[in-house]
């Protein structure tokens, strides 16, 4: 599936969150099975069968416990490598076949400076870019975004 916004395939645009561009995952409420930094790895997700680390099977993605014995959603905060207009979001669940989130949402902030990560995560002025939507497992799930604002965090 190729998503178009104004005739432009947003997946051909630069990934503002990717690590080589300076993106960083500054906060996550859980990373029990796989590290949050995997969210910003460049290129397609990789998987090698029978590779185990101290947290279990090694995946190129962020994996949480999901059922933690407390209410609430899993969330992470990514500081974009460069602030910019977000034309689309790809939720890549490659290699996650039974352990992927059934639905996701993405919100954004534009903030100056470098306040502490916990303060950023706790803010209540996040702007929804992608309302709660269903995603498939082991797939690239692209969603166009129709928003002209410049963002620093998702």
What residue spans do the PLM features occupy?
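Extracellular and analogous surface-interaction loops
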Residues: 75-87
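Trp- and acidic/polar-enriched beta-sheet ligand-binding modules for extracellular glycan
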Residues: 2-75, 96-154
